[in-house]
Protein backbone atom coordinates (compact mmCIF):
# COMPACT_ATOMS: atom_id res chain seq x y z
CA UNK A 1 0.00 0.00 0.00
CA UNK A 2 1.38 3.40 -0.96
CA UNK A 3 1.42 5.94 1.85
CA UNK A 4 0.15 9.07 0.09
CA UNK A 5 0.74 11.12 3.23
CA UNK A 6 4.46 11.08 2.39
CA UNK A 7 6.20 12.90 -0.44
CA UNK A 8 8.68 11.45 -2.92
CA UNK A 9 11.54 11.75 -0.40
CA UNK A 10 9.67 9.70 2.18
CA UNK A 11 9.02 12.67 4.45
CA UNK A 12 5.54 13.44 5.67
CA UNK A 13 3.84 15.70 3.14
CA UNK A 14 3.02 19.20 4.33
CA UNK A 15 -0.69 19.76 4.84
CA UNK A 16 -1.55 23.33 3.93
CA UNK A 17 -4.72 24.86 2.54
CA UNK A 18 -4.83 28.31 1.00
CA UNK A 19 -7.96 30.13 -0.12
CA UNK A 20 -8.58 33.59 -1.52
CA UNK A 21 -12.24 34.53 -1.74
CA UNK A 22 -13.59 37.85 -3.00
CA UNK A 23 -17.20 38.95 -3.28
CA UNK A 24 -18.96 42.29 -3.40
CA UNK A 25 -19.14 42.13 0.40
CA UNK A 26 -15.79 40.70 1.51
CA UNK A 27 -12.21 40.10 0.39
CA UNK A 28 -10.65 37.24 2.35
CA UNK A 29 -7.37 35.32 2.19
CA UNK A 30 -6.52 32.47 4.54
CA UNK A 31 -3.76 29.91 4.96
CA UNK A 32 -4.18 26.95 7.30
CA UNK A 33 -1.20 24.74 8.09
CA UNK A 34 -2.34 21.61 9.95
CA UNK A 35 1.09 20.51 11.14
CA UNK A 36 1.95 23.68 12.98
CA UNK A 37 2.81 25.03 16.40
CA UNK A 38 -0.26 27.04 17.37
CA UNK A 39 0.67 30.28 15.66
CA UNK A 40 -1.94 32.77 14.46
CA UNK A 41 -1.69 35.94 12.40
CA UNK A 42 -5.22 37.21 11.88
CA UNK A 43 -6.86 40.53 11.09
CA UNK A 44 -10.54 40.58 10.20
CA UNK A 45 -11.40 44.01 11.54
CA UNK A 46 -13.49 42.37 14.28
CA UNK A 47 -11.33 42.24 17.45
CA UNK A 48 -13.31 39.63 19.39
CA UNK A 49 -13.49 37.38 16.31
CA UNK A 50 -9.72 37.75 15.83
CA UNK A 51 -9.31 36.63 19.44
CA UNK A 52 -11.44 33.54 18.75
CA UNK A 53 -9.48 32.62 15.61
CA UNK A 54 -6.31 32.88 17.67
CA UNK A 55 -7.82 30.33 20.07
CA UNK A 56 -8.40 27.90 17.19
CA UNK A 57 -4.77 28.01 16.10
CA UNK A 58 -3.29 27.99 19.58
CA UNK A 59 -5.29 25.08 20.97
CA UNK A 60 -5.33 22.90 17.84
CA UNK A 61 -1.56 23.38 17.36
CA UNK A 62 -2.16 24.45 13.78
CA UNK A 63 -0.87 27.62 12.13
CA UNK A 64 -3.47 30.03 10.82
CA UNK A 65 -3.19 33.21 8.79
CA UNK A 66 -6.30 35.19 7.91
CA UNK A 67 -6.91 38.60 6.38
CA UNK A 68 -10.42 39.90 5.82
CA UNK A 69 -11.81 43.18 4.56
CA UNK A 70 -15.58 43.36 4.76
CA UNK A 71 -18.56 45.67 4.87
CA UNK A 72 -18.24 46.31 8.59
CA UNK A 73 -20.08 49.59 8.18
CA UNK A 74 -23.20 47.40 7.92
CA UNK A 75 -22.26 44.74 10.49
CA UNK A 76 -19.84 41.84 10.92
CA UNK A 77 -22.13 39.13 9.55
CA UNK A 78 -20.62 38.86 6.06
CA UNK A 79 -17.05 39.07 7.37
CA UNK A 80 -17.52 36.35 9.99
CA UNK A 81 -19.54 33.99 7.78
CA UNK A 82 -17.30 34.39 4.75
CA UNK A 83 -14.20 33.84 6.88
CA UNK A 84 -15.83 30.60 8.03
CA UNK A 85 -16.42 29.61 4.41
CA UNK A 86 -12.80 30.33 3.47
CA UNK A 87 -11.41 28.50 6.50
CA UNK A 88 -13.62 25.50 5.79
CA UNK A 89 -12.39 25.36 2.21
CA UNK A 90 -8.78 25.72 3.37
CA UNK A 91 -9.21 22.91 5.90
CA UNK A 92 -10.71 20.68 3.23
CA UNK A 93 -7.78 21.34 0.90
CA UNK A 94 -5.21 20.79 3.62
CA UNK A 95 -6.71 17.42 4.53
CA UNK A 96 -6.37 16.01 1.02
CA UNK A 97 -7.92 12.54 1.02
CA UNK A 98 -7.66 12.29 4.81
CA UNK A 99 -5.11 9.50 4.72
CA UNK A 100 -3.62 8.51 8.10
CA UNK A 101 -5.67 10.95 10.18
CA UNK A 102 -7.37 9.93 13.41
CA UNK A 103 -10.66 11.31 12.01
CA UNK A 104 -12.49 11.75 15.34
CA UNK A 105 -11.83 14.19 18.14
CA UNK A 106 -13.74 15.50 21.14
CA UNK A 107 -13.00 17.78 24.06
CA UNK A 108 -14.53 19.26 27.18
CA UNK A 109 -13.15 22.69 28.05
CA UNK A 110 -13.88 24.49 31.34
CA UNK A 111 -13.68 28.27 31.41
CA UNK A 112 -14.40 29.49 34.94
CA UNK A 113 -18.16 28.94 35.43
CA UNK A 114 -18.62 27.60 31.88
CA UNK A 115 -18.25 24.06 30.55
CA UNK A 116 -18.10 23.70 26.77
CA UNK A 117 -17.93 20.57 24.61
CA UNK A 118 -17.04 19.86 20.98
CA UNK A 119 -16.97 16.69 18.89
CA UNK A 120 -15.55 16.47 15.35
CA UNK A 121 -15.81 13.78 12.69
CA UNK A 122 -13.82 14.39 9.52
CA UNK A 123 -16.42 12.43 7.63
CA UNK A 124 -17.09 14.17 4.34
CA UNK A 125 -20.66 14.59 5.61
CA UNK A 126 -21.09 18.24 6.65
CA UNK A 127 -23.37 18.78 9.63
CA UNK A 128 -23.58 21.15 12.57
CA UNK A 129 -25.29 20.80 15.93
CA UNK A 130 -25.00 24.02 17.93
CA UNK A 131 -26.52 23.92 21.40
CA UNK A 132 -25.69 27.08 23.32
CA UNK A 133 -28.10 29.48 24.99
CA UNK A 134 -26.02 32.66 24.88
CA UNK A 135 -27.49 35.22 27.31
CA UNK A 136 -26.03 38.38 25.76
CA UNK A 137 -26.58 39.62 22.20
CA UNK A 138 -23.14 41.21 21.93
CA UNK A 139 -19.60 40.77 23.20
CA UNK A 140 -17.92 44.05 22.41
CA UNK A 141 -19.02 44.80 18.85
CA UNK A 142 -19.46 41.10 18.04
CA UNK A 143 -23.03 39.85 17.55
CA UNK A 144 -23.05 36.60 19.50
CA UNK A 145 -25.38 34.85 17.04
CA UNK A 146 -22.48 35.00 14.58
CA UNK A 147 -20.65 32.27 16.50
CA UNK A 148 -23.14 29.72 15.19
CA UNK A 149 -23.00 31.22 11.68
CA UNK A 150 -19.21 30.91 11.67
CA UNK A 151 -19.18 27.28 12.75
CA UNK A 152 -21.91 26.37 10.27
CA UNK A 153 -20.00 27.96 7.39
CA UNK A 154 -16.78 26.21 8.42
CA UNK A 155 -18.35 22.78 8.88
CA UNK A 156 -20.33 22.89 5.62
CA UNK A 157 -17.30 23.90 3.56
CA UNK A 158 -14.80 21.61 5.29
CA UNK A 159 -17.04 18.56 5.03
CA UNK A 160 -16.94 17.78 8.74
CA UNK A 161 -19.58 16.81 11.26
CA UNK A 162 -19.39 19.18 14.22
CA UNK A 163 -21.30 19.08 17.50
CA UNK A 164 -20.95 22.01 19.91
CA UNK A 165 -22.61 22.39 23.28
CA UNK A 166 -22.37 24.66 26.29
CA UNK A 167 -23.38 22.47 29.21
CA UNK A 168 -23.66 25.43 31.56
CA UNK A 169 -22.37 28.95 32.01
CA UNK A 170 -23.39 32.55 32.63
CA UNK A 171 -20.78 34.76 30.98
CA UNK A 172 -21.35 34.96 27.22
CA UNK A 173 -17.68 35.71 26.51
CA UNK A 174 -16.66 32.61 28.44
CA UNK A 175 -19.28 30.49 26.69
CA UNK A 176 -18.24 31.46 23.17
CA UNK A 177 -14.53 31.26 23.91
CA UNK A 178 -15.06 27.88 25.57
CA UNK A 179 -16.72 26.61 22.37
CA UNK A 180 -13.86 27.86 20.20
CA UNK A 181 -11.27 26.27 22.48
CA UNK A 182 -13.18 22.98 22.64
CA UNK A 183 -13.49 22.97 18.86
CA UNK A 184 -9.78 23.61 18.53
CA UNK A 185 -8.84 20.73 20.82
CA UNK A 186 -11.27 18.35 19.10
CA UNK A 187 -10.12 19.39 15.63
CA UNK A 188 -6.46 19.04 16.55
CA UNK A 189 -7.08 15.47 17.64
CA UNK A 190 -9.20 14.64 14.59
CA UNK A 191 -6.69 15.84 11.99
CA UNK A 192 -3.62 14.46 13.78
CA UNK A 193 -1.73 11.80 11.89
CA UNK A 194 -1.51 8.38 13.47
CA UNK A 195 1.12 5.97 12.10
CA UNK A 196 -1.15 3.07 12.97
CA UNK A 197 -3.78 4.31 10.50
CA UNK A 198 -2.93 2.84 7.11
CA UNK A 199 -4.86 4.54 4.36
CA UNK A 200 -8.13 6.36 4.89
CA UNK A 201 -9.93 5.78 8.22
CA UNK A 202 -13.20 4.57 6.72
CA UNK A 203 -14.50 1.15 5.75
CA UNK A 204 -15.84 2.81 2.58
CA UNK A 205 -12.29 3.55 1.48
CA UNK A 206 -12.91 7.29 1.12
CA UNK A 207 -13.87 10.22 3.33
CA UNK A 208 -14.56 12.85 0.68
UniProtKB/Swiss-Prot annotation:
Catalyzed reactions: D-erythro-1-(imidazol-4-yl)glycerol 3-phosphate = 3-(imidazol-4-yl)-2-oxopropyl phosphate + H2O
Enzyme class, UniProt record, top EC level: lyase
Subcellular location: Cytoplasm
GO molecular function: imidazoleglycerol-phosphate dehydratase activity
GO biological process, any: L-histidine biosynthetic process
Pathway note: Amino-acid biosynthesis; L-histidine biosynthesis; L-histidine from 5-phospho-alpha-D-ribose 1-diphosphate: step 6/9
Source domain of life: Bacteria
Protein keywords: Amino-acid biosynthesis, Cytoplasm, Histidine biosynthesis, Lyase
Secretion signal span: none
GO CC term (a single one): cytoplasm
Statement: the UniProt record of this protein carries the keyword Ribosomal protein: no
EC number in record: 4.2.1.19
Pfam families: IGPD
Family of the protein in this entry: Belongs to the imidazoleglycerol-phosphate dehydratase family.
Protein name, as recorded: Imidazoleglycerol-phosphate dehydratase
Amino acid sequence: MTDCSRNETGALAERVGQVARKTRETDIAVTWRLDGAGRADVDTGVPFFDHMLDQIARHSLTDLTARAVGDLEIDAHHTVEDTGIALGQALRRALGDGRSIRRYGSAFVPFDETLAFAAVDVSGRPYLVFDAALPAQKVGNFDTELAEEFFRALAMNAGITLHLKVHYGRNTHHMIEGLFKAFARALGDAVARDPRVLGVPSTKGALF
